[in-house]
Amino acid sequence: MIKILADDRIPFVSELFGDFGELILKPGAHIQNRDLLAVNALLTRSITSVDSALLEGTAVEFVGSATAGFDHIDSTWLKKQSIHWAYAPGANATAVAEYVLHCVAYLHKKNLLPRKSATAAIIGVGHVGCVVSDRLRKIGFTVFHNDPPRAQLEKDFISVPLASLANVDLVCLHTPLVKTGNFPTYHLIDNRFLKMLKPGSVLLNAGRGAVIDNNALLQCDHVITCLDVWENESTVNLQLLEKTTIATPHIAGYSKQAKLRATLMIYDAFLKYFHLSDTRRFSELQQLQETMTLNIQDGRNAEDILLTLFDPGRESQRMREALAENPDQFEYLRRHFPLRNEFSAIQLTPTPSALLRKELDDWGFK
């Protein structure tokens, strides 16, 4: 019998993994080495550091992380120990891209970003960056890419140098956090880059907090800042928080569909590793597959609809108020943040006009 220990916040972990052995659920922040001594499979999220301190001397042979990144996993050590591991790359790509669109809609409403002839730079064009690029193009942005490692691997990929991005209207960061090698991203956005950006340009980080030197950003007064990730999370620089136009607690990828996607990806890896058959209970997963109905009123445009679904300005104010009262509330806010529905899961009623339908199609509603 397989013994499985899982983070209790992984959606549908009981329904998917409960048939395969003994399943133990525990908060990810409280998982310790002694919990894993007789455990064969560990299912976790980014809140748990998976390294020698956690796994040394345990029976763990499979690690599944329901996350799009793996900064929290010591993959080198796991490989040396012949511990198989899997994660969920790209599971949250649509959710993050739609978070960016919500921010764009908010910035449009505040006249902080041009609606016509706007330009954007995507720094880090992997799973998420590709989707963000595609979605921005569909609403009229001219998009430039910066991803030197990808350009080195793909001869047809054009990576625009950072120094050529001084005049773009929107800079979106979607790189992993890399501290070594030929293409480090730690503090990639530094004082020099920030000074280069034109006044009024928007810097949006929904990747990794330490890709921006937050102290340099604190001294930067000519750029509009939108941050979902923060250097030294879960501690947030309160001075920087007050300067941001949009501030959220690392929730850009938080959609119901992204969470389910991530769980299913590690579920498939688990089945493959242990040579098991799929027993997923579709009826019990149905609620995350159903559409949400949203009533739209006459005269509304696509941006109004986006901001009805998720308003970054309102959420930013909520975060500021919460952290002003208690600076240690970041993880609480993140843990209890309501999951959004992706646009594909939203049914609009009554049927939009042909003009609004075209506008909604451009923004990604189908």
UniProtKB/Swiss-Prot annotation:
<dbReference type="InterPro" id="IPR020921">
    <property type="entry name" value="Erythronate-4-P_DHase"/>
</dbReference>
<dbReference type="InterPro" id="IPR036291">
    <property type="entry name" value="NAD(P)-bd_dom_sf"/>
</dbReference>
<dbReference type="InterPro" id="IPR038251">
    <property type="entry name" value="PdxB_dimer_sf"/>
</dbReference>
<dbReference type="Pfam" id="PF11890">
    <property type="entry name" value="DUF3410"/>
</dbReference>
<comment type="function">
    <text>Catalyzes the oxidation of erythronate-4-phosphate to 3-hydroxy-2-oxo-4-phosphonooxybutanoate.</text>
</comment>
<feature type="binding site">
    <location>
        <position position="175"/>
    </location>
    <ligand>
        <name>NAD(+)</name>
    </ligand>
</feature>
<dbReference type="Pfam" id="PF02826">
    <property type="entry name" value="2-Hacid_dh_C"/>
</dbReference>
<comment type="pathway">
    <text>Cofactor biosynthesis; pyridoxine 5'-phosphate biosynthesis; pyridoxine 5'-phosphate from D-erythrose 4-phosphate: step 2/5.</text>
</comment>
<dbReference type="InterPro" id="IPR006139">
    <property type="entry name" value="D-isomer_2_OHA_DH_cat_dom"/>
</dbReference>
<dbReference type="GO" id="GO:0016618">
    <property type="term" value="F:hydroxypyruvate reductase [NAD(P)H] activity"/>
</dbReference>
<dbReference type="GO" id="GO:0046983">
    <property type="term" value="F:protein dimerization activity"/>
</dbReference>
<protein>
    <recommendedName>
        <fullName>Erythronate-4-phosphate dehydrogenase</fullName>
        <ecNumber>1.1.1.290</ecNumber>
    </recommendedName>
</protein>
<dbReference type="InterPro" id="IPR024531">
    <property type="entry name" value="Erythronate-4-P_DHase_dimer"/>
</dbReference>
<comment type="subunit">
    <text>Homodimer.</text>
</comment>
<dbReference type="InterPro" id="IPR006140">
    <property type="entry name" value="D-isomer_DH_NAD-bd"/>
</dbReference>
<dbReference type="Pfam" id="PF00389">
    <property type="entry name" value="2-Hacid_dh"/>
</dbReference>
<dbReference type="GO" id="GO:0051287">
    <property type="term" value="F:NAD binding"/>
</dbReference>
<comment type="similarity">
    <text>Belongs to the D-isomer specific 2-hydroxyacid dehydrogenase family. PdxB subfamily.</text>
</comment>
<dbReference type="InterPro" id="IPR029753">
    <property type="entry name" value="D-isomer_DH_CS"/>
</dbReference>
<feature type="binding site">
    <location>
        <position position="228"/>
    </location>
    <ligand>
        <name>NAD(+)</name>
    </ligand>
</feature>
<dbReference type="GO" id="GO:0005829">
    <property type="term" value="C:cytosol"/>
</dbReference>
<feature type="active site">
    <location>
        <position position="233"/>
    </location>
</feature>
<dbReference type="GO" id="GO:0033711">
    <property type="term" value="F:4-phosphoerythronate dehydrogenase activity"/>
</dbReference>
<feature type="binding site">
    <location>
        <position position="253"/>
    </location>
    <ligand>
        <name>NAD(+)</name>
    </ligand>
</feature>
<dbReference type="GO" id="GO:0030267">
    <property type="term" value="F:glyoxylate reductase (NADPH) activity"/>
</dbReference>
<feature type="binding site">
    <location>
        <position position="254"/>
    </location>
    <ligand>
        <name>substrate</name>
    </ligand>
</feature>
<keyword id="KW-0963">Cytoplasm</keyword>
<keyword id="KW-0664">Pyridoxine biosynthesis</keyword>
<feature type="active site" description="Proton donor">
    <location>
        <position position="250"/>
    </location>
</feature>
<feature type="binding site">
    <location>
        <position position="147"/>
    </location>
    <ligand>
        <name>NAD(+)</name>
    </ligand>
</feature>
<feature type="active site">
    <location>
        <position position="208"/>
    </location>
</feature>
<feature type="binding site">
    <location>
        <position position="67"/>
    </location>
    <ligand>
        <name>substrate</name>
    </ligand>
</feature>
<dbReference type="InterPro" id="IPR050223">
    <property type="entry name" value="D-isomer_2-hydroxyacid_DH"/>
</dbReference>
<keyword id="KW-0560">Oxidoreductase</keyword>
<keyword id="KW-0520">NAD</keyword>
<feature type="binding site">
    <location>
        <position position="46"/>
    </location>
    <ligand>
        <name>substrate</name>
    </ligand>
</feature>
<dbReference type="GO" id="GO:0008615">
    <property type="term" value="P:pyridoxine biosynthetic process"/>
</dbReference>
